[in-house]
């Protein structure tokens, strides 16, 4: 898979760095070991952060700046990483979806980056381009219906949008039948070392909980 970062993104975030993780996997409805890790993370994070200080996490602060620069209110269209951590800090439980989605959510919270997870076999073409959503652009967010993505960073394949930091698209979503996983880590803070560490963490989780073939990743800018 080739990933292109458009001039639109370079204009609002010249320091952007991303990582693309790809792996053959075996998904499951639930994994107890993974949820033990998620619960332990939740207990720790509640002692370290508040709903205000979480905005200072570098990846979250950076994507909020990009939203504002693109004309989007980050408090109305929260980046997924922020929304997930906020939910834990408010004493709520996370939604349990399936092992791959739950695993990606943990990785997103652990590093503060918005991470897109996709069934790679549902992506049309061999290239994804990261740009900015346009007025009236159709986009069906997972569990959200039609989402107004004007001003949001968006990955597009040959057909249209597949992922934003707020919500991925129904068309390319991960299901229990997914065997070919594509994960995109979005480092709007420009911290390449941290983005690479996040990719390595995901590869480790995939081997532990999703029968991964080992997987690979590459960095793109």
Give, region by region, the residue ranges found by the protein language model:
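Charge-biased, low-complexity intrinsically disordered regions
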Residues: 1-221
